[in-house]
Amino acid sequence: MKKKKKLRDFPQITQFLLFLHFKTHLTMIETPPTFAPTADTYNLIKPLLSEGFLQKIQNEYLYWSQLKYKAKDTAPEQLWQAVKLYRRLNERTLQFGKYQFSYVLTDYIQQALHSFDMHIGGTLTSNMGIAEVDTHKFMVSSIIEESIASSQIEGANTTRKKAKEMIQKGTKPKSKSEQMIMNNYNTMQHIVQHKHEPLTPESLQYIHQLIAYKTLDLPEEEGAFRTHNDIYVVDFTNSEVVHTPPDAAEIPVLIGQLCTFFNTDTHTFIHPLIKACVLHFMIGFIHPFADGNGRTARAVFYWYMLKSGYWLTEYLSISRIIKETKKQYEKAFLYTEADDNDLSYFITYQLKAMEKAFEALKTYINRKQKEIFQASQFMKIAGVNDRMAQIIKIIYDDPERVLSIKEIENRFLISNHTAR
């Protein structure tokens, strides 16, 4: 009998999904039935379409373990065969190395893509009715929020308040958790400043170096592709491996193809948001680094979104939504791999997370607009400009507060000279 691998048997275990297992105690997902359509399978598709049942299943993009409970007048296995066949007939394929992936442009996905094109393809000013002078404040706050949330997904346990104060005041990180958050903040700033540059293996390694700085057991692994296969994604409840990344020898070719995918248009048009989701997933799938793959994947997602002209991405904290729905985030990865690398599960999840992030941004802006209006009252004082008014408002709200020059620099992203 083959001995089960336990957590202690793995020299290095990636935190990309491991922390999600520790926190949520997920069990292994159920494997779907083998795809084996018959003549009856084809005959079943038409009535399912006419009833609108199939469209609903597609828009939610149900996995086998969810779909089987929807069967009414047919056996669950037969329903799965029909749904799977319909997906196969409408799929688009992608190839990375020896691995083939697919995705389906469901009605929901197409509607979401159109909505994002309408709302996040411009600027904060044009889309949200915010004065140009205020956009900088929202960007700084959003970078901080994204940095904190992306680190917390991977297990950073510092509170949001403490982490925000650390970044704004420019104090040195005092723990690994704080270092992770500071690293993410520096990475986000780097991406915003270099968003138009191409992705290369070297630039991906540099992103990882920024993300992993002083957080790995082996410092030499910062910014270095792994050269070993001691990387596993493990289900904590039973210590079973749920994902084994490609062999380390495959990494150069896979990353090279991923960079080409990032930098150039494919022969068949792929919507930029779909490409961003694929890039996010593929970094997690390849696991090119010993650790920090999740943070790197989310950073590359943001980079591609900004490169593609979706400027409002700078103001969205998608990782905060992912942190709140990390069980679904993990399952989106697992469903994709378990169901013949069907990326539609992950794309659907990611677009829904973006929708929630956009709604959260609108709520945040409405609240901040009221604060900005209150701060603007101080501008009636002779010689007080917008930035000064904000500082006065902070002190007015908290008379005990002491603002250092460093905190003003970080809060407003300005030089030391201007802060003084």
Question: Over which residues does each language-model region extend?
Answer:
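FIC/Doc superfamily catalytic core
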Residues: 2-291, 295-420
